[in-house]
Amino acid sequence: VIVGFPGETYEEFKDTLSLIKEVEFTSLFTFIYSPREGTKAASMEDPVTKDEKSRWFKELCDLQESIASKRTSKMKDNIYKVLVESESKNHPGMLSGRTEGNIIIEFSGDSSLIGSFRNVKVTEPLNWILKGELQQ
């Protein structure tokens, strides 16, 4: 979702927020519009200030964070089939994988599990990732 495209009004932005509330995406890729030389949009009039775009962006991110938190909290204590992708980049000794719903889950396990599907129980739902426990 691009926030603050030239000509976008606050009313149009609120329509975007309404759609996001209705759909409740698992995740969003969001950006503040920035002009790119050579594009038509770069030469368009842009009455929205950078500060306004930043406020809109924060509003969008806060909304998505609350949606993500609501969704992941419902996953606690459930077991999911997970594709084990790699060792965790941020947590040594942990593996990282994805549920069938594309949600990242980290759990303890041997690196030999990478590339396989495993059942993992969600022990701690966070906004953007899950912590879990490998099931036998």
Task: Describe each PLM feature range.
Residues 1-39, 59-68:
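Conserved C-terminal portion of the radical SAM core fold
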